Amino acid sequence: MVRVGLQISATLENIDKLETSHPDYPFFVKLTCSNCGEQSDKWHDITESERVQQDTRNTAGFNFFMKCKMCSRENSIDIVEKSNVPYTADDSGKLKTIVIFDCRGLEPVDFSPRSGWKVFSSENGQSFEDVDLSEDDWVEYDQKNNNSVGVYEFVSKFIKLKK
């Protein structure tokens, strides 16, 4: 079992908080089999609120289950409960772990942010739902505070964590 953290960094303009629509946010990732090294070509979604039952060893199921096409090993990933945290104005421009994955036989290697993010403007301004970060930048106008808000230079990476 390996714990892998998803870290993000972005420049926030007039934004207090950026977060996923947890627990229903689908994390789109590309994966590598830890056993044989086979890397998936397609994006897989992992959602904390969804459980799949594929294994008799774990009656609670998993957030994601996949059998490797190359070595046939059965692998799973769970999102660690209460690990999903917001990215705040204080974090702007710095890498921060926003969610932790409990990986068994698989490791995420690439992340696609897509839509489903929530943005909260500074000074009790407007909040925006279902924000799409697939272009790594997002800009909108906060009518409550009469200023522009934006997420710029969005980047992500995965890091292995100690237990």
Swiss-Prot record:
One of its GO terms (molecular function) is zinc ion binding. Pfam families: CXXC_Zn-b_euk. InterPro entries: CXXC_Zn-binding_euk. Signal peptide: none annotated. SUPFAM superfamilies: MAL13P1.257-like (SSF141678). Keywords: Metal-binding, Zinc. Zn(2+) binds at C33, C36, C68, C71. Requires a bound zinc ion for normal folding and solubility. Belongs to the UPF0587 family. This is UPF0587 protein GA18326.
